[in-house]
A protein has these predicted regions:
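Alpha/beta-hydrolase fold catalytic core
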Residues: 85-115, 121-126, 133-139
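Alpha-helix boundary/capping residues
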Residues: 9-13, 18-22, 83, 95-98, ...
Length: 245
């Protein structure tokens, strides 16, 4: 019950106790304290029990992948039937559904992308006048470790603080960071990320996400690239999640 006593605890005791806690309390989930966080954010948004505001959400491409673990195609089919029921065959016929990464992970997509888009669709039902913007972050991230587009690496870009990072960023990264910071600042000020770049030129149009357009923005090494639709697999899974939340 004191810092002094905590410092006296054996490291292996702390490790084992943390292991017990983590087995019952999944990490990277909402810690609901009943005061500030009174429920699961996705469920609250799906029910319209949230603030009536414009929202921007997105993800880095390589983080939090969702997939179906299976040893082979037969097990994949059985699991698909358990998850999707009568729509299993439709799922299995989609491009990418039967593709494995070589480690028994099939139909890999970004879980955050699918959840965010499903949440946007639900929110639009409750707040039709509000705008919802989706982004996908996937530039090259330099370094000897070849890290990919890892969790929160977009923060250096959106805050335009690349120089404070030890990774060897170069000109194209700074150009992307400038654009992203502009988009974020515009959204914070007006609820709309669109506007002009530092040289006065119009930045690529970032359209809001709707059930009809599925629009968003992909940030790559060459800059900001508007996207106009989802792939069939993402669209199917988004609709599935929408009906579950």
């Amino acid at each position: 019950d004191t810092i002094e006593r905590a410092r006296q605890l054996d490291a292996f005791y702390i490790r084992d106790k943390y292991g017990e806690y983590a087995s019952k309390h999944p990490r990277f989930f909402t810690n609901m304290d009943g005061s500030f966080a009174v429920g699961d954010p996705v469920s609250l948004c799906a029910a319209g029990d949230c603030l009536d505001v414009d929202i921007m959400a997105g993800n880095t491409v390589d983080e939090f992948r969702s997939f179906i673990p299976a040893a082979d195609d037969k097990e994949l089919s059985a699991k698909a039937e358990g998850i999707f029921g009568e729509k299993a065959e439709k799922f299995l016929a989609l491009p990418g559904a039967r593709e494995s990464d070589g480690h028994g992970r099939y139909a890999s997509v970004s879980g955050i992308e699918v959840t965010a888009k499903a949440m946007f669709s639900r929110l639009k039902e409750h707040f039709p006048d509000k705008r919802y913007y989706y982004y996908r972050f996937n530039p090259d991230i330099p370094g000897e470790d070849n890290p990919g587009s890892f969790h929160s690496c977009e923060l250096w870009f959106m805050f335009e603080t690349l120089a404070k990072c030890s990774r060897p960023y170069v000109g194209r990264h700074y150009d992307l960071a400038r654009q992203m910071c502009n988009y974020w600042c515009n959204f914070i000020k007006t609820g709309d990320p669109n506007g002009r770049d530092a040289d006065g030129s119009q930045m690529p149009l970032w359209e809001e996400y709707t059930d009809g357009s599925h629009s968003g923005m992909t940030f790559v090494s060459e800059g900001s690239v508007p996207e106009g639709s989802d792939g069939e697999l993402v669209a199917f899974l988004t609709e599935h999640v929408k009906n579950k939340i």
